[in-house]
Amino acid sequence: MAIMIQYQKGVATLLITAILLSIALVVTLGSYKNLFYQIKRAQNEIKARQEHWLAEGGLECGYSQFLFYNGLPGTITDCGSGLGVIPQFSLISSGYKVTSHYGYSSLVKDILISGNMAHGAIQSASDIYVRGSVNIIPDPGVFNSDGWGCIALRYKNVFDASGAIQNDGVLIPNKPPYTGFLNPTGKDCQTTHKSSASGTLPIGSDFVKQPEMSLFEEFFDVSEEQHEKIKNNPKFTQILAPENTNGQPNIVPDCGQKILEQIENKHYYLWIEGGCELNAVYTQKVSEASHKTPGVLILVHEGIFSVMGNGELKGVLFHFNKDYVPSTQHWASFEANTYLNHNPSVIPDSFRTIASYYQHGSFTVTGGQFLDSSGQAAAFNNSLVFNFNKDVIDHIASNFVKPRWKEGSWNAQ
């Protein structure tokens, strides 16, 4: 009996030991399995980070090529890495979207190519008055499911017109807002961004009043206080008015002829210091000459500026007054004076007496128009027709503004 009891105790001990060993084995195997899982997870994380870094390198590779060519490269490479990480570029309203893929990592970032410019076909810190109708092919802005967020005019203070106002939209045949404009759904401006008004001012979101703006800084990426840096950029050809000692403003004599001569000599970026008038003869000739170029920039600084007659300029008109204050007497030597300051004038006094820009005749701009003379007025004594063209603006801006990454545009997919 004692032997039997001792035998049973031995069996129980062995059984308990076996159970404990089994439990230990299970725990050990579980630990190893967890360890293997952790190792595998760490390996995957390392691989994912490697793929992310390589994709990020692809973005920087694309950016370097864009800077080198000052635009989209003709042939896009992997920068000699041998890894085949070739960035892809797609055109967007503010510049280019760059996408880089490697493995399961996909990164996206935007390159800005036009300073800090906001959307808008015509942009004005000057008060604007149009004696006639207004027809604008707008900046398409940003696309969403309802259509394009078009912007026809962006202005600081006052906009008024005596005639009908029409946003012509982005579906005009043979007049896309930029090369490569993708609109596969064929949608026009959103209804909230396509104004049509007669007898009243437009209330749509395509005519934007923005009290805070600095057009010079937005275009050139330099504050207006530092405008001399831009003026002295070797890309600019300067046309200077002779100094006037009799208290009258400085005026460039034969300004239209001087502009034409410079364009014909392949100087396409002109900084005009002092007042300037393009008379009817030279408005036509300068317009014709501009179409033989990628686009001209005519910037008039510290003076009155008038454009008379007919023509379609390919380029950017920029009027920038920082310290100059206009007077009706300053127009005395200009052809524009006959119309602007005729008694009675067709331009309301609230605009006429502070006018520093005057446009008369069937003249239009294909490109961009920037009127940066705060507290002054721009008077259009004609029906205003304007064709936004981003290609022209970007080409001109790229000569003065270095392309850069857009802040906040990083996106990992």
Describe these PLM feature segments.
Residues 1-9:
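N-terminal leader/signal peptides at the extreme start of proteins
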Residues 12-53, 57-413:
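Compositional signature of intrinsically disordered, low-complexity segments enriched in polar residues
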